[in-house]
Regions:
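N-terminal acidic leader/helix
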Residues: 1-34
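Short, charge-rich amphipathic interface segments used for partner binding and complex assembly
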Residues: 29-63, 67-68
Length: 71
């Protein structure tokens, strides 16, 4: 399924960007960077919600976004 591959690629790109920010440590992020991290997390949550009832592992989102990026 080409559309599923595209969604997985989008998720990978967002996750990579969010992981890069997370690696700095939340306490070291400035307001702009923290805003970016929030936006990435919200984007991933929106995609998760759209895939409710499906296997999130298929698109690389089988994790708790809030715990990974915000808590």
């Amino acid at each position: 399924m080409e559309s599923l591959h595209l969604i997985r690629e989008i998720v990978e790109n967002i996750t990579e960007a969010a992981d890069e920010l997370r690696s700095k440590g939340r306490e070291n992020l400035d307001h702009m960077e923290f805003g970016e991290l929030l936006a990435y997390a919200e984007s991933l949550c929106i995609i998760q919600d759209a895939f409710t009832g499906r296997d999130l592992a298929e698109i690389g989102l089988a994790f708790d976004v809030d715990k990974r990026y915000l808590i």
